[in-house]
Amino acid sequence: MTIDEIIEAIEKLTVSELAELVKKLEDKFGVTAAAPVAVAAAPVAGAAAGAAQEEKTEFDVVLKSFGQNKIQVIKVVREITGLGLKEAKDLVEKAGSPDAVIKSGVSKEEAEEIKKKLEEAGAEVELK
């Protein structure tokens, strides 16, 4: 398989499939896909404050409630997770329990995107 063929295959992936690919590559090769951040020299007094503002990088998307539109929420869960109908239904019915994790270890951007999709379907979602 040539590099061009690999790129073509990657172009056909969905956002959730790309996120899964990145996660697997990070695990396989022990690297991170996070963009390097340029850090300016901070004054000594500001260094302690900067450490306190460290932001969480991995989030779990937890379903708190499926609301009034359970069927639509199940469809969105299937789209996000790739689960079958029964598995997605079982997951949605766990709403409110600690086991109702739709996706774990995702970036803030992906977690927000998943939350938005689920809320549009009528679900109540929490990011942990």
UniProtKB/Swiss-Prot annotation:
Forms part of the ribosomal stalk which helps the ribosome interact with GTP-bound translation factors. Is thus essential for accurate translation. One of its GO terms (biological process) is translation. GO terms for cellular component: cytosolic large ribosomal subunit. It comes from the Bacteria. The keyword Electron transport does not apply. Homodimer. Part of the 50S ribosomal subunit; present in 6 copies per ribosome. Forms part of the ribosomal stalk which helps the ribosome interact with GTP-bound translation factors. Forms a heptameric L10(L12)2(L12)2(L12)2 complex, where L10 forms an elongated spine to which 3 L12 dimers bind in a sequential fashion. HAMAP family: Ribosomal_bL12 (MF_00368). Pfam families: Ribosomal_L12 (PF00542), Ribosomal_L12_N (PF16320). GO terms for molecular function: mRNA binding; structural constituent of ribosome. This is Large ribosomal subunit protein bL12. Keywords: Ribonucleoprotein, Ribosomal protein. NCBIfam families: L12. Belongs to the bacterial ribosomal protein bL12 family.
